[in-house]
From Swiss-Prot, chains A, B:
NAD(+) binds at residues 159, 178, 187, 244, 298, 329. Binds 1 FAD per subunit. Pfam families: Pyr_redox_2 (PF07992), Pyr_redox_dim (PF02852). Inhibited by hydrogen peroxide, sulfhydryl reagents and quinine, but not by EDTA. Homodimer. This is NADH oxidase. FAD binds at residues 7-11, 32, 42, 79, 109-112, 131, 158, 282, 299-301, 427. Belongs to the class-III pyridine nucleotide-disulfide oxidoreductase family. Keywords: FAD, Flavoprotein, NAD, Oxidation, Oxidoreductase, Redox-active center. The gene is noxE. It comes from the Bacteria. Optimum pH is 6.0-9.0. Below pH 6.0 the enzyme is reversibly inactivated, above pH 10.0 the enzyme is irreversibly inactivated. The modification Cysteine sulfinic acid (-SO2H) is found at residue 42.
């Protein structure tokens, strides 16, 4: 069987590796317009903020690896068209050579692309996006310039908040804008996001929330020099747009069933409306166990797993995704937040009737006074069924990075908050309290 | 209704508090021969090893708290007999006053007692056990003596290993004995326990494993001065017996159905063979989801939860325990180990046919070279059903203290190792890798 994979980042790599390792013997062709693969975008802010010196280790696979496994890999090759009826992919190499690859099975792993705010001045020099390695390099080069002092970051989601931290670590003045009233609004309720806002402000990042960018203005050299919002005008030397991503599905969105944001609709086998076409990673929808429905959640962790599922199904073993909870985490200047499932706000937006239980305690036993950070927890649950649909944790302790994985499984398994109260969570003073804050938050649920 | 609770430590307190908070109006009598309550025994080594200065904060409840809630609480009062037929408890106060308390419902929360090795010289001065606060005080006083230099700890389970660390932190020479070939043998397989052995040895603790104590010898003042094993004789100034605990069920073991170690047999409502008698905490059996059967696991975390379950059932709300996995953790000189369910060795001893998948990786993304400890993981699963029945984690990273809670839930929910491979575990370089070591260990399972 011949399998063509368009897109060689996390999802495409996971699909190809699953096929190569578990179902050897298939002919695999991988195509990507980029020159590099497996770039860990979430490492950009760590590198650009000089928490690590170089970007070299932000990759985990390269074309030669796949060539060595017998894969035909075409980098810097742009797919121009897919003929779904005749099962052919048309592409052009860097040197304009025409490529036609027939397929038995096609895998769309084209990921997502940054949303471009359609504002006057959007194409000025000095306005950047942040997804690809090359975009990270461009921003790193800008940060190196002495004259680039004031940086506006538009969008205080994960990417925006992280690159704002990086800019501050590089000694820049940083203005962080968002239309929402807090940072991280899509993953956390205000009571939690405010903790990150305070952390950002304490570290000298200027917050401009509830504020909408209207226009970018240029200096004489055509470089962005001002950002105009619905509230004021600010002098800036650089703008980084981080208002979000959308599915990069143009190649197929007119032929295959798509979600409201253009993402390719798939079932739990990652199969699209065309049985010979699979879609994986950020280009595809995904089943949310919190929502109990398909939705769109662009995360590298989902990309990897969806690739594994597609690889098995294409390889011949029927395997359903167990669905996801949108588990995520962020660490800014040592302040950590993790969440999974839906926030109260997100749940209400989706019409779910929910309640929540909040609690705050020290991570470790109260009698340990050193290195014992406080932890805020919120458990969100359906009021009637009491099924857990979300959890948020915030602390300087890293242990919350493990505990959120338990909540992710609890949502997947449709556990109620009352069942969670009885879950066997171990106790050792070095790590937690006899009445673990997760147990107490669950016990306290009205 | 009148409810008598015998034993006022974690399980008894949880039962009483559940009744008081959720089902007010019952008459509650609490009886305990001890003068203190709610002592966190797992804090003893932390206090005696001077990681904290004083024991004052190792308690979370006192008799007056319960008196204020209308409870009749009799401390330093020893129950001599229970007349199950006539539902009466006979006890004697410190001043030898006779107490008779009739009950509608009785709760046995008498905990566990240290196993005393029946060896010549077992009653010599300078031979200690470690369960109660008073026993912690006695050991602390011994550690303060200049002349007490060489300390033998018999039994390298959790309590023995922790008090060995404490003795070393107090500058003592420490000899740690165990009949097994490693420390922590009941919770960890050798490949994992060896990591703790190396850690103990590196910190100067003399390990004597695969060695059985035979006799204790005394000096002229009747103080223990030598320990004789099946291999050699050792001069010591103090012996701390930590060979384990057994259910403290003498008051009822001849009248109620008991487990092979004398623990009171209970169902998932914590009800004993006598419908008016409940048993909670270390005196009772408990349902193990790993084993899919009742067994005996003496842990404070189980004690708390079993008390909550009993309180609800007595109060009138039918509630089944969700069972436990025996989740546990230990941290010795900053080396952390957590486990849940059964080790390979424990599973095989119980006749289960199991396989396991091991993996080792850094906790955080590979490109973070600071504060990024390696983590060893073992997932144990039934060979045929591939149901996960155990997990072991070892690292200097504290994040394993959260991750083990996910495995505890996975065992409770009978997840297979293949389902675990697809679980939504988030990725952020600050906390983990794109291919999380838990995902990889599950993917690698043969």
């Amino acid at each position: 069987m011949k399998i063509v994979v368009i897109g060689t980042n996390h999802a495409g790599i996971a699909t190809a590796n699953t096929l190569l390792e578990q179902y050897p013997g298939h002919e695999i062709v991988m195509i990507d317009r980029n020159s590099n693969m497996s770039y860990l975008g979430c490492g950009t802010a760590i590198w650009v903020g000089r928490q690590i010196e170089k970007p070299d280790e932000l990759f985990y696979a390269k074309a030669e690896d796949f060539e060595a496994k017998g894969v035909k890999i075409l980098t810097e090759t742009e797919v121009s068209e897919i003929d779904f009826a005749n099962k052919k992919v048309y592409a052009k190499t860097k040197s304009d050579d025409e490529i036609i690859e027939a397929y038995d099975k096609l895998v769309l792993a084209t990921g997502s692309r940054p949303i471009i705010p359609n504002l006057p001045g959007k194409d000025l020099k000095g306005i950047h996006f942040l997804k690809l390695f090359q975009e990270g390099q461009a921003i790193d080069a800008e940060f190196a310039k002495e004259k680039v002092k004031r940086i506006a970051v538009i969008g205080a989601g994960y990417i925006g908040t992280e690159i704002a931290e990086a800019a501050k670590r590089r000694g820049k003045e940083v203005l962080l804008f968002d239309a929402e009233n807090t940072s991280l609004a899509s993953y956390y309720d205000e009571e939690f996001a405010k903790g990150m806002d305070e952390n950002l402000a304490q570290h000298g990042i200027e917050l401009h929330f509830g504020e909408l960018a209207k226009e970018f203005k240029a200096n004489e050299e055509g470089y962005v020099s001002q950002i105009v919002t619905n509230k004021a005008t600010y002098d800036v030397d650089l703008v980084i747009n981080c208002i979000g991503f959308t599915a990069n599905s143009a190649l197929a969105s007119d032929k295959l069933a798509t979600f409201k944001n253009g993402a390719i609709k798939v079932d739990k086998h990652q199969q699209s409306s065309d049985p010979d076409v699979y879609a994986v990673g950020d280009v595809a929808t995904i089943y949310s166990n919190a929502l109990q429905d398909f939705t769109y959640i662009a995360l590298a962790s989902n990309a990897v797993r969806s690739g594994i599922v597609a690889g098995h199904n294409i390889g011949g073993k029927e395997l359903e995704s167990v669905g996801v909870q949108g588990s995520n985490g962020i660490s800014i200047f040592g302040y950590n937040m993790t969440s999974t499932g839906l926030s109260v706000k997100a749940a209400k937006k989706l019409g779910l009737e929910v309640s929540f239980s909040d609690f705050e305690d020290k991570q470790k036993a109260w009698f340990l006074h050193e290195n014992n950070d406080s932890v805020k927890i919120r458990i969100v649950y359906e009021t009637k069924s009491r099924r857990i649909i979300g959890a948020q944790l915030a602390s300087k302790s890293e242990i919350i990075a493990g505990n959120i994985n338990m909540f992710s499984l609890a949502i997947q398994e449709k556990k109620t908050i009352d069942e969670l109260a009885l879950l066997d969570l171990f106790f050792l003073p070095h790590f937690n309290s006899p009445y673990n804050y997760m147990t107490v938050a669950a016990l306290n649920a009205k």
